[in-house]
Amino acid sequence: MKRNILAVVIPALLVAGTANAAEIFNKDGNKLDLYGKVDVRHQFADKRSSEDGDDSYARIGIKGETQISDQLTGFGRWEYNVKAKGTEAAVAESSTRLAFAGLKFANYGSLDYGRNYGVNYDVNAWTDVLPIFGGDAMAQTDNFMTGRSTGLLTYRNTDFFGLVDGLNFALQYQGQNSDRTKNKGRDTERSNGDGYGLSSTYDVGYGITVGGSYANSARTADQKEKVSDAYGKRAEAWNIGAKYDANNVYLAAMYGETRNMTRYTRTIADTDATLIANKTQNIELTAQYLFSDLGLKPSLAYVQSKGKDLTEGKGFNGDLVKYVSVGTYYYFNKNLSTYVDYKINLLKKDNELGVNARNVFGVGLTYQF
């Protein structure tokens, strides 16, 4: 009996992180769902890598909908994350991951504004499914439209106005976030000028989906003048990808490039400095298989980001990220799971950029609702 339940529940959990959210209100066209998880985790690594030790956190979110008419629906979502690795006396490492609201117009799509995922992540999300690591070749939080970011106005359309099944697209505008705006105080590397982006995915059938995205933004004055050797006026990113998800097999691939955008840490005179790469070429490959009767899902992935023209002479290329991830999930039931993940770093320990090249092993337990 337990095996039959797992065979049904586990695929549902893999579709979305809020698959088993608790419905706390549903009346007169108003609906409110609560979801969250507690993820207790410990990582083992060389002490010099700064990746050894506890990395536990808790996360909670609310999703709401209100039916305005038979053609118009309002919606909103808020998600908050709290790190649990510090002391009670320390300032809590907490942050708002998502906070947006909008309107959905039947088959004409939805329009929302707030803190949300950038359109470049629509494709990158397919490979960002590893137990601990992954998704870091190109996507970065508060880095234009490659990951979660602030000030995003997003239009999304499903099934191309109801005319083509499986053809989805999104258009996005991002307002400036810098010392010149109301939310000033952020690092130069996490600032952005006005920009736009678009993405499209198509469900071909037979478990196959393909997609791509493009984003182009103005850079702030500080980014052009003070950070690394990326002096271009515009920041650009694009990616293409594909995934296969059927018969308990999951395969995904993503290739993308960025210009004047990607943050990386480099050791200069024994001091770590955060810089912006002039150009990066990024690849992520993921393979997983779900043994649904056992509740076991092994995972294998390859992740690489190669920086191009990183020095003043514009002639030095070097890997910013390069590793293999070997791990697995084990699902006790729909609410409780455990996992292990081993990051085999393929960077040379004496690489010229001084990028962290240590292996990391992590293990954790997750309760989600």
UniProtKB/Swiss-Prot annotation:
Localization (cell): Cell outer membrane
Extracellular side: 45-55, 84-97, 116-150, 178-193, 220-234, 260-278, 309-320, 345-359
CDD domains for the chain: gram_neg_porins (cd00342)
Periplasmic side: 28, 69-70, 107-108, 158-165, 205-206, 247, 292-294, 333-334
InterPro entries: Gram-neg_bact_OMP, Gram_neg_porin_domain, Porin_dom_sf, Porin_gammaproteobac, Porin_Gram-ve, Porin_Gram-ve_CS
Transmembrane region(s): 22-27, 29-44, 56-68, 71-83, 98-106, 109-115, 151-157, 166-177, 194-204, 207-219, 235-246, 248-259, 279-291, 295-308, 321-332, 335-344, 360-369
One Pfam family this sequence matches: Porin_1
One GO term of the biological process aspect: monoatomic ion transmembrane transport
Keyword Signal carried by entry: yes
Main location: membrane
Membrane topology type: Multi-pass membrane protein
GO molecular function, one term: porin activity
Leader sequence segment: 1-21
Keywords from the named record: Cell outer membrane, Ion transport, Membrane, Porin, Signal, Transmembrane, Transmembrane beta strand, Transport
Keyword Metal-binding: no
GO CC annotations on file: cell outer membrane; pore complex
Function description: Forms pores that allow passive diffusion of small molecules across the outer membrane.
Family membership: Belongs to the Gram-negative porin family.
Assembly and oligomerization: Homotrimer.
Name of the featured protein: Outer membrane porin F
Species assigned in the record: Xenorhabdus nematophila (strain ATCC 19061 / DSM 3370 / CCUG 14189 / LMG 1036 / NCIMB 9965 / AN6)
Lineage: Bacteria, Pseudomonadati, Pseudomonadota, Gammaproteobacteria, Enterobacterales
Gene: ompF
